[in-house]
Every structure is written in structure tokens, then in C-alpha cells.
Amino acid sequence: WFDAMQLEEGLTLNHFNMVQNSDFSVTGTDGKPKAWTVGKNDASYVEVLPLDAPKDEFHAPDCLKHDNTQKIRLAGRYDRTVTYYQQFRHYGKIGDRFTVGGWCSSFAKKNDPDNYIYCRITVQFTSADPVTDKSYWATGGSAVFNAEEGNWQFASAGIVAPNNCTYIRVVLQMNRQMNFADFTGIYLYPEAFGTQYVYDKNGNRKTRKMLYGGQEKSEFDGADNLTKHTAA
């Protein structure tokens, strides 16, 4: 099978969203969004709702309003994580780069990674068979949303595959949270995110690698004075 074939002139290609049914508009006969899965034992805390209802206190931006667009609401629980995810086959290598992002309207607490409190979109990778309980999912990064009082916000982040993989999982997560969070417009692009910087132990920028291959290098003396700079 072949999909998303493109022929373009230029240095860059257009975005291709690896996430299917990213706005939850396509549903099955059971009314549930296709291609998405409720986390284990999380059914009581996940709802599918219209994107914008007259009674909503905070309305979604116009750019999200398409035919049948819906949102996923995850209820916060103080003692557990609540997830909603999509997984798909992808053969990749360690170090592969992606960009993940989406929209969220939350009444969540401030994120606290040390105590595992967060509201986010996480991308995970496995080289095992995800049908079995033995598959280990390694995290490649997350797009984290700020604590808010309902306003819609957009978040995006760079993702790096931590290992070779045969499957990718994009996960909406509410962990040890309060109230609820609504998600929609989820995407995962198979490309690097922005510009990569490398610094030495003194904070001097040694290299800058651009998204499309260009790279700059800098050298410093013992007093942190720039002695050489090259660009390619």
C-alpha cells in the first residue's frame, strides 16, 4: 500500500500529519472517533464532545471549526493518569526527529514533572509488538500545556526517537490532575523542529544546525573568547 505521495519543487516539503482523524470528526457506528483508543481502565474519564457548544464558557478559535470537528475531554484524577491515544506502524531509527502539537482547553493544575503532574501530548516509541503486554514504550518528548482557566491554547514540541521503532503512539495525558482538559487538532509531523543548538560547559554556543541542513560552528579560547566561526 502507498499513501501521501508528493512531488514538489523546492528545498522543503509540505507538512504530512501522521495522526489520523486528528480532529475526531470521523466516528464509527458506536459514535467513537476512529483510529483512537481509550487508555486501560480510563473509559469512565473520557468523553467525546462537540467542539463548540452554546453553553461552553470558552469557545474554540475559528481555525479549528470544520465540519463535525469534535474534542476529547479527559477528566483529571488526583491518584492516576488518564490517557487517550493513537498508535500506528512506523519503521524508524534512533534519532529520527518529529514535531508534535495540538490544541487544549484545560482547567488543570500547574505542571510539576517531579511529582508527575501534567497535562500534555506525549509521543512514545516501541520496537516490540504493542498487542502484547511485554512491549515497552519509550518517550521521545512531549508538548506540555500551561495551567489555564479554560482558554484554548496551542502547544508544539520537538520529538526525538529514543530507540529504533516499529510503532509510534501519540498520547493525550492528564496525570494526577484536577478538573478536565479538552483536546483537538492533534498532529505529528515527520520532520525536525526548529534549530538545534549545542553548548559547551561554559554556556558558549559551539554549533547551530538549521532545519534544512546548514550548520555553523564556533571555537573559543580558555577565556571564552570567540576564536573561530565557520558556516556551511
Write out the residue ranges for each language-model feature:
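Beta-strand elements of repeat-based all-beta scaffolds
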Residues: 97, 107-108, 136, 192-210, ...
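Extracellular and organelle-lumenal recognition/adhesion modules and their flexible linkers in secreted
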Residues: 1-200
